Amino acid sequence: MSLRHQITAVVLAAASSLCVAAEGRLSVHVLDQQTGTPAADVHVTLEARTDGTWHTIARGATDTDGRIKALLQADQPLAAGDYRVTFHTGDYFRVHNTATFFPEVPVVFHVQDAAQHYHIPLLLSPFGFSTYRGS
């Protein structure tokens, strides 16, 4: 990966952490570190854990900017508890004719304050990824 692509990925990641999606309680942003561009059309599943079992509560796909601004709509309840957002990355890489070691990236997180907005950026490459709690 060229230095220019690395710098672009870092700048995009920083920008994503500054953006708060007022439309929903949960947003995601996927950036392709190999190309330094947003990852469009990555399918994402959101699940909640109830009594030790995962239940799907929302699905979506990233837009041309690599974002889902409201994976969970503002009027949908977000209770305190454990959640899992799974980024289905295999199809994204397949469309781009790129082999990947990670066909999906599950991110488990805990909600303490249901009134807050939660943002989960994913920095993605074919053989690695990084995520964190954005704002």
Q: Model regions: which residues?
A:
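Feature of secretome-associated and extracellular-like proteins
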Residues: 2-3, 80-135
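Short Pro-Gly-centered beta-turn/loop motif in secreted/extracellular proteins
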Residues: 69-81
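Beta-strand-rich domain onsets/edges
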Residues: 5-39, 54, 130-135
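Solvent-exposed strand-loop boundary residues in beta-sheet-rich modules
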Residues: 34, 50-52, 91
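Short, acidic Ser/Thr/Gly-rich low-complexity loop/linker segments typical of extracellular
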Residues: 52-71
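Hydrophobic beta-strand segments
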Residues: 42-46
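Short loop/turn segments at connectors of secondary-structure elements within structured domains
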Residues: 22, 38-40, 79-81, 116
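Short, glycine- and charge-enriched coil/turn segments that flank and shape catalytic ligand pockets
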Residues: 21, 50-53, 75-77
